[in-house]
Amino acid sequence: FLFAQLSQMNRICEQRLKLWNCYHTLLQPLEEEGLLKRPFIPKGCEHNGHIYYIVLPSEEYRDTIMDHLKQNGIQGIFHYVPLHSSPAGMKFGKVMGHLPVTEGYSKRLLRLPLWVELEESVISKIVNQIQRGLEELK
C-alpha cells in the first residue's frame, strides 16, 4: 500500500494542494466577515496540503459547527489536544505556568475532510454547510 502511494507521490501531493486551495478560496468570504480564520502560510513558505482546518471564534462555535456538519453527513473533528495536557505530556512534561494561547486554539480549531479523492463539488457542499451553521449562530 505504501509503495503504491510513493509511486504516485507527485500526483497525490498536487491533488491535495488543489483541494486545500479550493477550501482556502471558498472560505475566504467567511474569514473576511470575521466568522472564522483560515490557515496562514507565510510568504516564501510551502506546505503539502495534508490537512485543512479553520479556527472559530469560540469552543461553542466549533462544537456547534462540528454538530451541524455531522447532522449533514460530514465529519469535522477537533484537531489536537495540547501536548502539555495530553496523558503523556501530563506524565512526562514540564510546563511553567498557564498556556492560554495553546489551550484557546485547541478549543476553537476544526479540521475539515481532506483526502486525495475528495471532489471539489463536495468541498463546496462542506463550505456551504459551514456557512449555514454560522448563520444559525448569529
Model-derived features: where do they sit?
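PLP-dependent aminotransferase class I/II
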Residues: 1-138
